């Protein structure tokens, strides 16, 4: 996330072809397009994943490819325009499978509840940021970055076989703790992304490819928020 601080100094990282002033509304238009791809992909995947064993075998590869796209688009901003739609498509497959698992375990209503909650969190965070109540400082960025890396390391360690209690649970107290931590990081990431948009918009030398980079980063943050909202809702219902 500290990439934001370096971006204005590394204009070549985005490419200056067809340069024009970046506008925030263009970023959010592209975000809506990417979210649309993700939602369609997830909706198509959900009813198929329980019936097709071949599709189930593709979930982990799709997850790894989506991770690769997210890293490529984050550390090579000029690639964001190409990898963002691919990431959205792959992440939709992953989210569809995960959402189906939660719907089966807890109830089908959990998915629309999580979608509405995610949208409300996004709008709420944007309103709070624009009101000036939250200031994105280097210390804030550093804290969210460290927390993100730590949580990512925990998930990777779990995938490699390390037993971390609660990290894979759908519901329960430990899953709730991981969900709250993940949601806090996701919300912090949204604030950082909003700050990026605001800062980039004032730099008229930036290429319009920055819009794709910023919308891509916003999508990654939204995915994190949605997944952790699912965990929190599932944990809340399992404790009743």
Features from the language model and the residues they span:
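A hydrophobic alpha-helical transmembrane-helix feature that marks the membrane cores
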Residues: 1-240
């Amino acid at each position: 996330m500290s990439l934001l601080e370096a971006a204005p100094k590394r204009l070549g990282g985005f490419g200056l072809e067809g340069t024009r002033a970046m506008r925030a509304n263009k970023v959010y238009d592209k975000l809506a397009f990417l979210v649309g791809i993700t939602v369609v992909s997830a909706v198509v995947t959900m009813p198929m994943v329980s019936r097709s064993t071949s599709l189930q075998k593709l979930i982990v590869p799709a997850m790894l490819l989506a991770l690769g796209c997210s890293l490529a688009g984050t550390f090579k901003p000029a690639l964001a325009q190409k990898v963002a739609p691919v990431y959205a498509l792959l992440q939709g497959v992953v989210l569809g499978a995960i959402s189906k698992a939660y719907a089966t375990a807890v109830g089908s209503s959990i998915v629309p509840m999580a979608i509405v909650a995610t949208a409300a969190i996004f709008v709420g965070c944007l309103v709070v940021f624009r009101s000036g109540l939250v200031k994105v400082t280097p210390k804030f960025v550093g804290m969210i970055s460290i927390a993100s890396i730590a949580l990512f390391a925990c998930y990777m360690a779990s995938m490699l076989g390390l037993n971390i209690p609660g990290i894979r649970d759908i519901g329960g107290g430990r899953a709730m703790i991981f969900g709250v931590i993940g949601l806090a990081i996701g919300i912090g990431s949204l604030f950082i992304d909003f700050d990026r948009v605001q800062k980039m918009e004032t730099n008229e030398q930036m290429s319009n490819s920055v819009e794709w980079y910023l919308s891509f980063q916003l999508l990654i943050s939204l995915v994190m928020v949605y997944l952790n909202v699912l965990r929190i809702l599932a944990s809340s219902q399992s404790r009743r």
